[in-house]
A protein has these predicted regions:
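Alpha/beta enzyme core
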Residues: 2-323
Length: 323
């Protein structure tokens, strides 16, 4: 925690966090679209997207050379080119734990920062002989010749003026990210979004919902036990119990490009979705994006869903990114 934040009255920290929550709350009931170009960003804006996330044009090329996990943060030039073309908010992605990268994104005037778990995260290694934590770019367990567990660093988000979006595979991760200052939680990516299995997204949403139900139905003793298990404050668990949901917007992410899947995720309690770039592989991306917005707004209307299934050509998958 920075010296400035330690000296800051708690009311000011809370006021700044409330402002960030106001921004991310505006995304509820809408879609955020990942894009590879300004042209795709314009199409997303026209379809009603709440925001866009530019990602690297050379991402797939670099993965072919260096293998999975070689993703880089998006170049600021690509972000600026999207900002010049659209009026909706633009979200910048940074490596998990990379504070300076996040500061650079904030200076670039992005609306939000997505602390992404798959773009070469910064990790820490505990060296027992020296009683120190060593930070290094994503590396294998057992580095430095010691048997240890490597863990990912996370950015402490409260000092930032822009809101953060963070991924979570379960409720424990979601609550930790919120305690760090995240203003929107999405489901985590198990692999790159282009190859992520949509069933894993459904599984994570169900898992988080089941854990929330456990909190809602638990007594104070159970809450204290869960607070210790999750390593979060009891006050945060009480907020979840009172609201019967996460205290921040909750989005589904990972291989989302089929409107009928979006309808299912919304029916499960998601506040919105982050759409994969795979949507632009559809024969008519504009129609597909419009259908996703329809699925978000009318997920409980079977007549509307029948129409979007017909336009999508059934339930089956679209061609792969290389097809």
């Amino acid at each position: 925690m920075s010296q400035e934040l330690r000296d800051e009255p708690p009311e000011e920290t809370q006021e700044r966090y409330d402002r960030k929550l106001t921004i991310t709350s505006m995304f509820q009931g809408k879609m955020i679209v990942t894009v590879l170009s300004p042209i795709q960003a314009v199409a997303a804006e026209a379809a009603g997207a709440a925001a866009v996330i530019p990602i690297n044009h050379i991402k797939m090329f670099m993965e072919r050379i260096e293998g999975p996990g070689s993703n880089r943060s998006t170049e600021l030039s690509a972000i600026n080119s999207v900002m010049d073309r659209v009026l909706i908010p633009v979200i910048g992605r940074v490596r998990a734990g990379h504070i300076m990268e996040a500061k650079a994104m904030e200076a670039a005037k992005v609306c939000c920062i997505d602390e992404h778990e798959l773009i070469n995260p910064i990790t820490t290694t505990y060296i027992p002989e020296t009683n120190q934590y060593i930070a290094f770019k994503d590396g294998p367990d057992g580095a430095y010749g010691y048997a240890h567990k490597t863990t990912k660093m996370r950015i402490y988000k409260q000092p930032f003026k822009v809101p953060f979006i963070c991924g979570a595979a379960d409720l424990g991760e979601a609550l930790k990210r919120i305690q760090e200052g995240a203003s929107l939680v999405r489901t985590a990516y198990s692999v790159d979004d282009d190859t992520h299995d949509i069933s894993k997204t459904f599984e994570m949403v169900r898992k988080i919902n089941d854990s929330i139900a456990e909190i809602v139905n638990g007594d104070d003793v159970r809450l204290y036990t869960l607070a210790s298990t999750y390593d979060v404050s009891i006050e945060l668990l009480r907020m979840v119990k009172a609201a019967k949901r996460l205290p921040v917007p909750f989005f589904a992410a990972g291989c989302i490009f089929m409107p009928i899947d979006v309808a299912m995720l919304m029916s499960m309690g998601c506040d919105g979705v982050i759409v994969s770039t795979r949507v632009f592989k559809a024969m008519c991306p504009e129609t597909r994006l419009n259908d996703i917005m329809t699925a978000i707004k009318h997920y409980d209307d079977p007549v509307q869903l029948a129409g979007i299934i017909e336009r999508a050509g059934g339930y089956g998958p679209m061609p792969t990114v290389n097809g």
